[in-house]
Amino acid sequence: MPKASDIKKGSAIEHNGKVFFVKEISKLTPSGRAGATLFRMRMYDVATGSKADESFKADDMINLADFSRRSATFSYVDGNEYVFMDSEDYTPYNFNKEAIEEELLFITEETQGLQILIVDGAPVAIELPSAVDLEIVETAPSIKGASASARTKPATMTTGLTVQVPEYIANGEKVKINTTEHKFMSRA
């Protein structure tokens, strides 16, 4: 059993007799000398989809839930449901738009490297690759010779994501975006 300080974003844990998927973790360090470091976790109940915020002391022991990862690709949208197809056995996995709203900013039909997390036979979350290639649909005109400066400008991708890009990048270009930091990495 790992300690709360060892739990990472994207883990499936057992808490109060239920299985939760950890979406966010923030570390709270009290200013007093005797205060213990707390880890605040935003979690989603796998069975109901309800949100829960819990705080754990750094040395609290937490049970990890059994889960598996399956390689998948985005297939199609059916109303409010997004359908992903297993890359090996073509099993469809449905997700409600609200459950994967943040991940949708990085997913296009060409996105490779998606992983579906499965707990008790049910899909609970999508794990993004570390970087994705997205096309810019709206940004200020590129400035010739701007490659020497480190200035940036906002650019909107086809998915609706807005990131800061160097001034020499133009509309229609494909760029590589870091999915954890939401930052421009390079041209694709």
From Swiss-Prot:
Pfam families: EFP, EFP_N, Elong-fact-P_C
InterPro entries: Elong-fact-P_C (IPR015365), NA-bd_OB-fold (IPR012340), Rib_uL2_dom2 (IPR014722), Transl_elong_fac_P/YeiP (IPR020599), Transl_elong_KOW-like (IPR013185), Transl_elong_p-like_YeiP (IPR011897), Transl_elong_P/YeiP_cen (IPR001059), Transl_elong_P/YeiP_CS (IPR013852)
GO cellular component: cytoplasm
Molecular functions per Gene Ontology: translation elongation factor activity
PROSITE patterns recorded: EFP
GO biological process, alphabetically ordered: peptide biosynthetic process
Family: Belongs to the elongation factor P family.
Protein name per its UniProtKB record: Elongation factor P-like protein
Biological source species: Aliivibrio fischeri (strain MJ11)
